[in-house]
Amino acid sequence: MEHLLEVKNLSVSIDGPAGEVQAVRDVSFSLKKGEVLAIVGESGCGKSVLCKSIMKLLPPSAKIKEGSICVNGQDITCYREKEMQKLRGRVFSMIFQDPMTSLNPTIKIGKQIGEAVVIHNKNYTKEQVNKKVLELMELVGISHPKERYHQYPWQFSGGMRQRCVMAIALAADPDILFADEPTTALDVTIQAQILDLLREIQMKLGTATILVSHDLGVVARVADRVAVMYAGKIVEIGTAEEVYYNPRHPYTWGLMRSLPAFANGKESLYTIPGMPPTLIDPPKGDAFACRNEYALNIDYEEMSPMFKITDTHYAATWLLDPRAPQIKSPVGGTAHE
């Protein structure tokens, strides 16, 4: 299947008060039509910057230093704002973290969704716009859409506001939907509902989705593939089954061990020791080495390449080198077989 989105060797930096932050470092991945790719990692690892780089929503202080971004085979890396405006909404759209900051509290929900419809369908009559708005509200599970159409965001619960934001994002039937931690501000029960809704919409419309999260447990129920990101780099990528049931990178082991499902009830919940490195001056070698209890000497000297485990599963750890000692994974299996 042809790739809908292909990112190759992408590096993005941001100028800050203390220096240049290397937010995204040599990242490559692809996305097929109708696929759900989850990007997981700690806060500050570059997940959101990566997505905003693709949509060209970066602040003026940020710039793409290297790499390419191709959509439907077309290289958009050097596209300017005018060209990107034609792609946003129709080719890709984004759901942000906090729905309350994405909605105008003084404008009725129906009008806000309608504005998104009109931007991409300028020839629509008022009746056509209203019909499309009601269809979108039904699609995202907003009950009694005709009545809710005339209500304000503050009259909706957090989960319902997120559904409104999803309706706006889907107004132009995008090919790719970026969901940037869409459940962070919601309670656990509502999180599950929103994730199920994302999966339902993806299956109904065939929309490819990139789901950003810091929680491996959250994405388990919806992802087809999972990319684990650390310090601006993808350190492991594979199908959801491969990453969950046969993780190979020590950082992925740490994320898995920190899930409540792995706790036995007698010991404290596992936490990864230390702090992520500064990306103003990333450490030599593997950025995770100083937090990695399984680190080898070479980890402190040289960055690991991506080792192929299967045709769909790759991990950047020297433990997969045939010369490395065989380490038993704390979450099952071994580092290399």
Where are these regions (language model features)?
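Short catalytic/signature loops enriched in Gly
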Residues: H3, S143-K146, T239-E337
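A short, proline-enriched helix->beta-strand linker immediately N-terminal to the Walker B motif
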Residues: A171-D175
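Conserved ABC ATPase "signature" region
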Residues: Q74-D75, E127-E147, M256
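The feature captures the beta-strand-to-loop junction immediately N-terminal to the Walker
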Residues: V40-G41
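P-loop NTP-binding/switch modules centered on Walker-like glycine-rich loops
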Residues: K56, F178, P182, L186, ...
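Conserved ABC transporter NBD signature motif
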Residues: I64-D75
